[in-house]
Amino acid sequence: IYQIIEHLLAFEKYKKLVIYTNGMIPLKADYRDLLLNEKIVFSVTDYGDLARNTSGFVKQLEDWGCVYRAHPPEHWTDSGRIAKQHRRDDQNQKLFDECCGKNLWTLSDKGFGRCPFAVNAAHLGAFDFADDSVVAVGDAEKLKKYVVDQNFLTACDLCNGRAFSADEITPAIQTRTPLTMEL
């Protein structure tokens, strides 16, 4: 992730790079100077008893002098269901344009995604990781096109939408049974 952060900081059009985290994975001390970049801000969601390492992570940010905001879960919408929406391209473009998650870059063990929904849907088998919704980290040419030129993702047609104006739901409720995908 540190190489990706370094790469994204090189883009002049990005004035801030917000790193959203639950603080479960501690930061590597070797990258302290990188993380002190004036463009970087951490947004740490504290899930209370569901995430035991958050307070230690926040202390690490404080000790290092990183800019951060720690907060409980907020602004959750009903956007976690994976179901084929059968939209036209222009409708998916509109959904993407209004989406609050289209720039929530998400790194996984299999690729890099524009939004956590796309990465999670790919992990659950809704589409292949070779799809346009997630790219391999090592493919610099495709990564640049993905970051700069993407109009919408294939994953958009599986998403209910995450507009800033969407109704909010109670956050962090864990399901007792797996949800089904309607593909």
Locations of regions flagged by a protein language model:
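Distinct, well-ordered alpha-helical segments
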Residues: 1-6, 27-34
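Well-ordered, non-membrane alpha-helical segments in soluble/globular domains
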Residues: 3, 52-57, 90-92, 139
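Core AdoMet radical
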Residues: 12-26, 39-74
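Short low-complexity, flexible loop/linker segments enriched in glycine and/or proline
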Residues: 33-34, 58-59, 82-87
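Flexible, charged surface loops at secondary-structure boundaries
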Residues: 35-36, 150
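Conserved strand-turn element in the central/C-terminal portion of the radical SAM core barrel
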Residues: 42-49, 66-102
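Accessory C-terminal segments flanking Radical SAM cores
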Residues: 82-183
